[in-house]
């Protein structure tokens, strides 16, 4: 995100290209296909976030930050909303269904490096964690209005993202939703689209 944003401010295409290259093929979770860990399409219009087995606060942060990256790239002429046949939308649908309905979603166990500095977190995540459900975050209007208004997708394809957008309502901006850091992850400009 930093490289993509720095290009906007400094007008340095080389920095932007580095960020975009990492977003597509990097070796860390900054790569979209690593952040969105498992794709259930075409059976379901869902793609599981790597953080889904950890907690919903981190999952929602990922939705918000990836949305910002997609929008920054869109402003530069690169369409990451459509990347990998709308992978980001499937990730949004998955997270929104987990967080704003009582429906169940498929889950694929995520295993990560067991020897690291976060010894208190299970290295094998075997289920969607319900902690943090129903949190309001200023993240849903951006993907909903992009896919609805720019991509002309039907509400059927945006079912859960629409539910989340309606649940949050008009985005109040950073810090509006709660006093911890999650309320500041994304500033909430999506409603302005």
Residue ranges, per PLM feature:
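Alpha-helical transition-metal enzyme core signature, strongest for iron centers
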Residues: 23-26, 59, 63
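Short amphipathic alpha-helical interaction/hinge segments
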Residues: 27-34, 99, 103
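Acidic/His metal-coordination segments adjacent to aromatic residues that form catalytic metal sites
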Residues: 30-56
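Secondary-structure capping and boundary motifs in well-ordered enzyme cores
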Residues: 55-62, 87
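CBM-like carbohydrate-recognition segments
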Residues: 80-193
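Short, small-residue-biased leader/transition segments that mark boundaries at the very start
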Residues: 1-5
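Structural helix-adjacent loops and short alpha-helical linkers that scaffold large soluble proteins
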Residues: 7-28, 71-89, 147-158
């Amino acid at each position: 995100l930093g490289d993509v944003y720095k290009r906007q401010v400094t007008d340095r295409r080389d920095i932007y290209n580095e960020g975009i290259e990492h977003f597509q093929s990097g070796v860390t979770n900054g790569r979209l296909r690593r952040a969105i860990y498992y794709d259930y399409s075409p059976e379901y219009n869902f793609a599981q976030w790597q953080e889904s087995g950890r907690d919903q606060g981190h999952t929602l942060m990922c939705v918000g930050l990836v949305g910002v990256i997609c929008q920054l790239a869109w402003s530069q002429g690169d369409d990451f909303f459509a990347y990998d046949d709308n992978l980001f939308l499937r990730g949004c649908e998955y997270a929104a269904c987990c967080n704003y309905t009582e429906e169940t979603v498929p889950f694929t166990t995520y295993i990560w490096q067991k020897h690291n500095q976060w010894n208190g977190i299970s290295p094998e995540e075997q289920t969607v964690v319900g902690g943090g459900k129903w949190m309001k975050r200023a993240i849903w209007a951006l993907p909903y209005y992009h896919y609805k208004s720019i991509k002309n997708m039907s509400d059927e394809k945006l079912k859960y993202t629409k539910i989340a957008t309606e649940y949050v309502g008009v985005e109040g901006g950073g810090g509006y939703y709660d006093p911890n850091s999650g309320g500041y992850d994304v500033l909430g400009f999506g409603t302005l689209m």
